[in-house]
Amino acid sequence: KDFSYIRKDLDLLSRYLQVASKEKRVGVNILMHGAPGTGKSQLAKVIGKKVGTKVFEINMTSYEGDSLAPRSRFDAYQLAQQVLARRPNSLLMFDEVEDVFPAYRSPFRSFEMSSGNSKAWINRQLENNQVPAIWISNSLINKPIGSIGNIVLHGLSPLFK
């Protein structure tokens, strides 16, 4: 897919990730949102390639093809953070985040309510991740951005509308 129509935004996100990687910053998170089919997942991969990182996607299904439970996906994310922290030039992509955290339309609110984890615990996970992560949602979160940790909010319809 051609993203030339958002070249400035693509360059901005790429520079942000390059600096974060070079300086080994922790807590680097980007939230992309937009309607289904707008190319959010492809854009995340393009950004990864442009920055020179390998993009690792958190699975949505088991090896048997069954949907993973929300907690299993978040556990996979935490494991990937630990494993990839030792691998330079890695980027995590967590797609379809609203399927995992459907209530409240926030990627973190329903997980917080259903798992018993507090907002503070979730924020700590985001603020301390060693590997930059791109979180992808088909809808805008319904929560003030400052209350879900260190996330660069980036929409895709059009970007920086």
PLM feature spans:
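Pre-Walker A (pre-P-loop) alpha-helix and adjacent loop at the N terminus of AAA/AAA+ ATPase modules
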Residues: 2-30
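Short glycine-rich substrate-engagement loop in P-loop NTPases that contacts/grips substrate
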Residues: 55-87
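Substrate-gripping "pore-loop 1 plus following alpha2 helix"
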Residues: 72-76, 105-128
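Loop/turn-to-beta-strand initiation segments
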Residues: 87-92, 127-134
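Walker B catalytic acidic pair
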Residues: 95-97
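Short regulatory helix/loop adjacent to the ATP-binding pocket of P-loop NTPases
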Residues: 125, 137-151
